[in-house]
């Protein structure tokens, strides 16, 4: 079952997003293994990212092997604080 992850960064900016995504995605046009979609944009008080993964396990693999280690090392110009996170089992996904 597909698995969704929403990260909200209060006070986050487009510039911080660009620096962070460059550090954790394989390239500007490629998603990490197991990720189906990625959308991001400004929200009322910061920056919000929503990703859908093939399974909860593919999310956890990306989180544990790539995302968290790189964020803990510090990403130059990236988000200064960890995100507020919510997750969900995807009931329906449409193109």
Task: Kindly give the residue locations of the regions a language model identified.
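Short S/T/G/P-rich N-terminal loop/turn motif that feeds into the first structured element of a domain
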Residues: 1-50, 54-69, 77-95
């Amino acid at each position: 079952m597909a698995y969704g992850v929403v990260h909200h960064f209060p006070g986050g900016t487009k510039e911080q997003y660009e620096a962070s995504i460059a550090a954790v995605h394989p390239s500007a046009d490629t998603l990490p293994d197991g990720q189906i979609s990625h959308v991001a944009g400004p929200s009322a008080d910061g920056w919000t990212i929503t990703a859908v993964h093939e399974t909860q396990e593919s999310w956890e693999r990306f989180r544990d092997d790539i995302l968290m280690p790189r964020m803990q090392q510090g990403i130059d110009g990236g988000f200064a604080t960890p995100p507020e996170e919510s997750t969900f089992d995807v009931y329906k996904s449409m193109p």
